[in-house]
């Protein structure tokens, strides 16, 4: 049998796909999921050998790759070798339809079924496929295997991409398992660019074995880091939070199985990177009527288009400014003005721009500054500021301007501009951008503008609708503290006059980041509960002197009053029988040989 390799190299940034994906393959068998993940790992070893960072396995791209492999077999009965699917879509069109919103389009295929090592060997032996596999611009990968149950026809698809808003973390080159808790992490830096929604390069990071970052401290960013997993056996997840010079954060994670033999029935796309269209916030202050949210949208004097328009002005070092620098406009020679602009931001969505300004003299009742926004040809402002509008000198203060960036082919710019118009120095730290106010509730699920949430930090600002607003804080994205107990019920079966049945256990799980205490109690003299480990309660029954019959009791696990899900009541049923009869079911082996 002949196997053909094909490739396509193109880059395309997803936005608002309109095509449909059609029918799709059946659920992926565990052995094929294993092959997909192993192919990703072996490809990363090839990248390592050529000095290229590893790729993070991605769920939406894998779904796209699986669909195309299935389509190329089941909907092409005469065989097929190419990149155009039966709905007329190329990879750059197909991959976004499955939810991936980064750059995509590069694709490797095998027009036949190959095992992981053979597939990587074949691709590395072909110059074009090798170039795709070793492309340093790719950060994520989708891998799709398909093979017919009858006939054996198969197809392999490998899709590549990178999303500017997502800096992946990869454990041990995306290996499925490790027997050694000491692992190597590759932590991607954030891509700069992306307009006013972009991030700066990572300055610091923290690493933890739990999503709460318990005990973690900020440390200088490094792409490669040694790390130790918690001991024992099972799946382990490592979380990495990075932040740039102005404090914009993002969180990424990866998982690996710690142990000798990975359970293939536990493999799946839940282990891959993904994205969502919304994010849920917890612990919001419901004492305010409204809240504004921002996915770290901030622009300052370090942005590439920031510049002095006219008059006296320069960048200055400022220890209290975000990022350590600001832009000062000075008196002399008339007014002075500076601006910053972009063509990349979310359109037709109401926002509020907060200009973070300070002056060195606030005594004037006349105008000392003006601020202005222009979005797609529509002017907002200018807002005139008097010296007395500043509550103190040399202290930054936020001034809001509501705006919408309209879609306008004749004017594609979003512009923030500020003037010095008086005798005081006017210094701009930067401009925060928040979505328009919405009612406060907690938890609150926020559909993000652009619909592509990938772990970025969320800023919160509360407002009262009368011009007052709170300081900015970072939202809590971890679920509120909750008490969870399993199993939900216990049943004991005993024989009168015989020893009591074996003990059973309850597992207590604390969700959320704030530790809490809990206790256990019961309401029956024949029931005994004992805390044997930090999260396990051992339950015994004592049937001494008990008559034949059915007995009911209740175990109560209760945490502090503010913990959700508490108390938890676990019903216990004890059945004492005169005699317990054990039966054994027959096992029949049938030989179907002719």
Residue ranges of each PLM-predicted region?
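Short carbohydrate-recognition loop motifs
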Residues: 315-336
